[in-house]
Amino acid sequence: MKRYLMPLVLTASLALAAPAAAATPTLDKKTIAMMDDITAVFEYSALTPQYGNIENDNDGCGWTAGWIGFCTATGDMLDLVEHYNGVKPGNVLEKYTPTLRKLADAGSDSVKELGTKFPADWKAAAKDSVFTQLQIKIGHEMYLNPALAMAGKIGVKTNLGVENLFDTGLMMGPGAGDCDGMPKIVKETTAAAGGTPATGKDEKAWFKTYNQIRIKHMKKPCTPGREHDWPDAVDRVQALQKLYDDGKQDLRAPLTIAGGWNLTITDPRD
């Protein structure tokens, strides 16, 4: 489920005392699909993205739906639906756009305004390949692209390193202004480690420190309301750390996600 409640900032800018940024990592389609499937495991205990899932977790997000948990309270669901309207006018979700905008502007987690038919209409939209492809595209623009930009900035070379940054941004925020977000954790890790992979620090050791700092943020978050659910989700970080411990930096299938899931991804696909 989506847990990021601060306004979306799609830049991963961060001032670091480092030399010129390394090249942004290039991911092949199978690796990207694997990252999407890891998200499906973490979010829904599923092996592939769950585009039609919609639920109210009473966690401050309002309706949480789609493969990454687009939320009515945060504005990312509004962004998705507006893109869908542009590509496919008259779609089943278009009529909800004004209400989605109102909820996003207010940061409201109310689910009443959208009416009782909204969940069914979301599920209907999820049967449309245009909508599911947009879910992937928008999700990557919001969270994977900032992770790749940050990876290039700090010299991350491995697929698992990018996955760590991607998952943190997706769960805790990709923006420099978020007090628990991915850039904040990168900054604290850089200080604790005395540098980044770009300055010669071992990437595996660097991410071990990164994951320890991320868990500290999850156990005692400064993001309002997250103290109720983030402490229970640290197994997500522990599962990523185990992939490091097992030498799975390339994220090649078959890949077993440990922790409370113990699910093996054998055929990565969106």
Predicted regions, residues:
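Boundary at the C-terminal end of the N-terminal hydrophobic targeting segment
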Residues: 17-23
